[in-house]
């Protein structure tokens, strides 16, 4: 273990957890995790450009939250090893995996290279993080394909 997590790190994680419990944030997370299954960059851009829809607000809220959390790690305010524990940042990997295959196109079409940049840096920043991202990407891709197929009739 390079740097041992401190009580300050633990308090920061608990504050991040409290932010995730806020009522509107729960709705936003629920939408992103369960209902939002983009099949391509245009599906993401449709929501990103549907200002001021509820889905647009939720996408910005979830993305902004995880970008903020990742920036704390990138700037040394939060211990990376602690942050990478599945119960703390597992959701971050999942939301990144949903847009990861389309990120280059999304960034180009929005003319914004910073979209998901901090999240991506943390997810690619260590061997442990890269292994998790690889695993989550695979799982999300299987789920995405299942979501795209019409339900079979019995």
What are these regions (language model features)?
Residues 1-154:
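Acidic, Ser/Pro/Thr-rich low-complexity regulatory regions
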